[in-house]
Amino acid sequence: ARATASDEGPPVDDLAAGAGSGFLGVASAAGEAGAKSVVTPERRMAREFAPDKKTLDALRHEGFTAANFVPDSGVIRGVSAFVSLGSGDPDEAVIRPETFQHMAIDAPRSSSSESSRPRAYPGSLMGVISVIRQTLLDARFQARDHAHFSQNPASRPRPAFSTMLDALQPVTAQKMPVVFEPASVLMVDRAARLAGEFELRPLILATGQEWRRPDIMRGIDAPFIVPVDFPEAVKLPDDEDWQAMPLDQLRAWDHAPGNAALLRKEGREIALTTHGLARKTSFRPNLRLAIARGLSQDDALAALTTVPARLCGLADQLGSIAPGKLAHLTVFENGRAFDEDSRVREVWIDGRQYPAPVRDEKKPAAKKDTPNPRHTLTAAPSNHDRGPLLEPKSVLIRNATLWTCGPEGRIENASLLVTDGKIVKAGRFKADPGPGTHVIDLPGIHVTPGLIDCHSHSMIMGGVNEGTLPSTAMVRVADVLNSESETLHQQLAGGLTVANLLHGSANPIGGQNCVIKLRDGAPPEGLKFVDAPAGIKFALGENVKQSNWGDAFKSRFPQSRMGVPAFHTNRFTAARHYMAAVEKAANGGPPVRRDLELEAISEILCGERLIHCHSYRQDEILAFLRVMEGFKVRVATLQHILEGYKVANEIARHGAGASAFSDWWAYKFEVLDAIPHAGAIMHERGILVSFNSDSSDHARRMNLEAAKAVKYGGVSEEEALKFVTLNPAKQLRIDARAGSLEPGKDGDFAIWSGHPLDTRSVCLQTWIEGRQYFEREAARQRASARHSEHLALIEKAKKDRKSVV
């Protein structure tokens, strides 16, 4: 059902309805303190430049004559200033007072003491990205709103003015570049996408993890500022401690020195920085290590001279030796700039000489003819053992038991043909393989549709909950997909092909979900199930009223179960008012601030976004359904739904699906009446039922979760399997492509050693869109290869420790 935007009501900013930017914690003149404290684009480092002699000396001793002085805290941090590193008056040292705006994409961190008291928004990585997105939208809106007022001063109120948003006008107008500081290689991708979304001029501070996803770097058209802060080999006392060091940590240590060379190989322009170095004296030794790992000396020199000068808009003053340019020079002795024995003799800044002290750089204890173990790469190439194992034109399975989960039911001695990623035939037919067909003919195998998990929190970076506010409809799980998680491989090993990644249950209105296919090896965007309708997480019960959060959490509304429906009513009412204002603006009225929270709720009202609601108790379930019916909204799924069996008729009448736990009960007070027969009872009453994992571990054996519907309630085997295949596909509105083995659907299937509901059966192969992503024997070989790589890296790390003692 679709709601209209013409409902009468108070203005959009009526706080009684819970509307207005202040409610969201989005930075504004009257905004919530949390977001304001981390959004400070008006900060100017030119006003704060007051370096101590020790800092200046350390940089000059490494050969630097000028530097870009950057803000180091917050999300939108402020404007950097390019300064000379001479010892004169700091005000006279400023060469360019406004260089770049800086934005950090990193999950907020808190101490153990801070975790026991309320935190301000944003409290998660997805919240940080939402703050950046909303603030940039607000900056655009301020410019548009003031322009409209200047043309219509007599017909509307004067708009508010924010110095913070005014500071972002050069950014949104593409007059000032933005340096994004992502915390991981996947956030490099997100930074580039944000820059594209808002047509910004981006630079990227490299994370040191670019080796993980060179394919992502290949597609990013932005210069990189590259630290030479490499992790050191950990010194551990005995072999057992070494064995406990994770392979991924050793890989990161081994790959790090080659990061700059990799970026140049991928065609990215780089500038080098001392950022992250605990000791500036490590800069030149680390740079020589980067050169040994493939960075050319010419590229290294350019990355310290011409490139940063041009990126900072100072190519006419710095970066090369030429008449008319500033007299900034670095003099080396004992060889060229980056030779092993060369050293900085002196620097000249604005025509003044600064001699470098004579110092003995640490030399390796090993003999000169002993090669440095870090000069070569031992770790396996990134992503080499991920991605499709087979990509045939067609795949034909013969002599199998097909569990179609469609009208044909279970078929013995059947065949399945998949071509170009789509199912062509399923059943008993003459199966003659054509050219390029991969044939699977194994005795006793069973084939099911790929399993689907309707409630997962796996593969989410930087926090599952944005729990700082009662409504966080503006945050998006799609912004923080973790394509590098080993969980992908582990869940493929259980036959899982699709997962509904949900925000947590910390608030009555949570964040937007993301449905993915488990295409292990793909980048974050490659995981997304593109045709899946948009959705959002809601929640009821103990979690949202904070009764289980601790004594310090007593100020956020709602604090009672009866407050939850009131809150939902407030936010949906606010969304109606927002829709009316947007409609009025489209018909010539004043522009309306785009509000990402209310926009998402408006999509629910328009039938464009599905609700997946965490729910336990029957009274709350009924109250929630009645509130939604009042707004002409049909709930897509009630998640967990532990007391759903008590109100099964009402749920069926509403038309909501039930995505339930198979057999969870008595793990907290509000689930004391939960029973393992709930799924079967709701199924009998005509509710579309699925079983979900809510657990990265349980998601590895969803077939056995389905089997519990047979044990508890006597559901037929074929119907029970649908609880983890066709039914969740229908709940997610993706059943046109997934959930059953029928012609025209995606070639997503799992091959089992025996009956799929038998505890003794194992998944042999998992295919997605006609590509093989898991094969049991290949997985064994993968584990063996990783073990050998782990041992080799441990030995290399031990040698490196000895070489620097």
Show which residues each predicted segment covers:
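His/Asp/Glu-enriched, well-ordered alpha-helical/loop segment
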Residues: 21-26, 30-34, 42, 177, ...
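N-terminal pre-domain segments of enzymes
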Residues: 10-28, 364-391, 793-795, 800-802
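Aromatic/His-enriched, Gly/Pro-containing loop or helix-boundary segments
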Residues: 9-55, 315, 442-443, 457-461, ...
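C-terminal cap of metal-dependent C-N hydrolases
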Residues: 322-364, 400, 742-786
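Intrinsically disordered, low-complexity segments enriched in small/polar residues
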Residues: 2-32, 143-159, 231, 240-247, ...
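Histidine-rich, glycine-flanked metal-binding segment
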Residues: 1-12, 17, 407-448
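Polyanionic/metal-chelating signatures
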Residues: 49-202, 206-211, 338-344, 349, ...
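Histidine-centered catalytic micro-motifs
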Residues: 1-2, 452-459
